[in-house]
Amino acid sequence: MGSAESREGRRASFGMDEEERVRVLQGIRLSENVVNRMKEPGQPSRVGLLAPPAAALGPSGGREKDSKPPRPDCGSGRGPPRVQVDPLERCDWEQAVLQDELVRVATTEREAAASPRSVTLRRGEGGVDQEKQRLAQRARELESQEEELRCRDAFYKEQLGRLERQNLEAYRLSSQQFHEAATKIEGAIKPRRVEPVCSGLQAQILRCYRDRLQEVLLCADLVRAYQHCVSSAHKG
């Protein structure tokens, strides 16, 4: 379980519970005792000589005779003899290391996942501030445009009133001048008395025609006298 062959031949798979604790390792759910031991810092590893179990020697004792004890390398100067770690302790140690690595990876992932949100929030706040500034600037521009329109409206109203007053004054002056000129011309023209020409002869001719309807030729002398009178009036 803790040997190099086991580590190279099997891959560790893990799962985390709601408290972010590793509970599954290589398909095996960890117990509370193992988790507690993984949490304890600085736990000394129990190292001792690993004696082969009695079952591994077999029923016959011939192998004990053939097997030779290992010779210590006293003269080599390479240090103390090699010791073998208890597989259970080695498994616990590997699980503790794996637990620390998983916690570190989970923490790193949480920080990496949280940093874009914080950056996005800061960017969002900056965007909101920029939008507020843009709206405030637009409001000031609209207020300035409205003020300019009010000034122009007042100016045009004043100019229109001035033009109306000028036109009214010009109309009154023109009307007064017209009446004065008409009165002056009427005074300069002399009236003439018109009387009908040869009115007496005209009345006699009309009476003659009424009295002598059947003898109108008898009125010829009066007609000639009326024509002579009219011709004289034209000449005179």
Swiss-Prot record:
Superkingdom of origin organism: Eukaryota
Subcellular localization: Mitochondrion inner membrane; Mitochondrion
Domain CHCH: 195-236
Residues of the signal peptide: none
Residues bearing a lipid moiety (N-myristoyl glycine): G2
Keyword Protein transport tagged: no
Coiled-coil portions: 127-167
Region ranges (Disordered): 1-22, 34-86, 109-132
UniProt feature, compositional bias: Basic and acidic residues: 1-11, 62-71, 122-132
Motif Cx9C motif 2 in this chain: 219-229
Main location: mitochondrion
Biased composition, class Low complexity, residue ranges: 48-58
GO biological process: cristae formation; DNA damage response
Extent of motif Cx9C motif 1: 198-208
Xref: InterPro entries: MIC19/MIC25 (IPR007964), MIC25 (IPR042860)
Keywords assigned by UniProt, alphabetized: Coiled coil, Disulfide bond, Lipoprotein, Membrane, Mitochondrion, Mitochondrion inner membrane, Myristate, Phosphoprotein
Pfam families: MIC19_MIC25
Cysteine-cysteine disulfides: C198-C229, C208-C219
One CC-aspect GO term: MICOS complex
Family: Belongs to the MICOS complex subunit Mic19 family. Metazoan Mic25 subfamily.
Subunit structure, as described in the record: Component of the mitochondrial contact site and cristae organizing system (MICOS) complex, composed of at least MICOS10/MIC10, CHCHD3/MIC19, CHCHD6/MIC25, APOOL/MIC27, IMMT/MIC60, APOO/MIC23/MIC26 and MICOS13/MIC13. This complex was also known under the names MINOS or MitOS complex. The MICOS complex associates with mitochondrial outer membrane proteins SAMM50, MTX1 and MTX2 (together described as components of the mitochondrial outer membrane sorting assembly machinery (SAM) complex) and DNAJC11, mitochondrial inner membrane protein TMEM11 and with HSPA9.
Function: Component of the MICOS complex, a large protein complex of the mitochondrial inner membrane that plays crucial roles in the maintenance of crista junctions, inner membrane architecture, and formation of contact sites to the outer membrane.
Protein name as catalogued: MICOS complex subunit MIC25
Organism whose genome encodes this protein: Bos taurus (Bovine)
Taxonomic lineage of the native organism: Eukaryota, Metazoa, Chordata, Craniata, Vertebrata
